[in-house]
Amino acid sequence: MAEIILKGRGISKSFDGIKVLENIDIDIPKGSFTVIMGSSGAGKSTLLYALSGMDKPDLGQIEYKGKSITELSERQMSKLRSEEFGFIFQQIHLVSSLTLFENVTVAGCARKADTADVIKRTEKLFEKMNLSGVRNKLPSAVSGGEGQRAAVARAVIKSPGIVFADEPTGALNRSNTDGVLDLLSGIHNEGQTVLMVTHDMHCALRGDRIIYLDDGHIKGELSLGGFVPADIQRQQRLSDWLAAQGW
């Protein structure tokens, strides 16, 4: 049985008296690519923010690597996020005054890693992600796809326990979307745990495990196994399952 790296029990969250999450139980296995799907307003991003410690739930407990993180102070939680979690958002989160290369190397030093080693690993990442030609450009001077690939590099450079991705391709065209998804699939194949929120079936196909969220409740779960490009049966299986959930 796979080790559970992140666990949530009884997670509930309300905004202005409206329940967004209600009594959610969820396990994230180490090395998995878990996708949380659901329609707009289902509570997907709220659940991701709760699990990552970005927004505390009203009720419930969250454990990371077997230890409770629910009662950590904001300072402790900030340190944990900086050292253990990587984040990719729909809107590209990069420091505007730093070059793409500097954005990634600064993030890589969060664990007080050797600077020379971080630079070497960043160079390898930029080669792998086809960013070497724009490494010295500011975020404002590159395309959306290039910026988001740099954001992926920034998220993984410190070898985080989990990469949290909230609609990471929502602002990209199909070509750039596939480029970012290929990167996420690649790091997952190397053993990285990924938790991604999406409303797009094309993106969800990259996951090996799909959780369907509806009106603040987990309605179903589907195991897809490893991703295989152009797998028609995989696509049909996910499509049929989503239809059964009321998608």
Can you describe what each PLM-predicted range is?
Residues 52:
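Helix-to-loop junction immediately C-terminal to a conserved catalytic motif
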Residues 60-68:
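Conserved ABC transporter NBD signature motif
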Residues 82, 137-140, 158, 190:
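Conserved signature/switch motifs of ABC ATPase nucleotide-binding domains
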Residues 98-107:
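Short coil-to-helix segment of the ABC ATPase nucleotide-binding domain corresponding to the Q-loop/switch region
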Residues 138-142, 146-148:
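Conserved ABC ATPase signature
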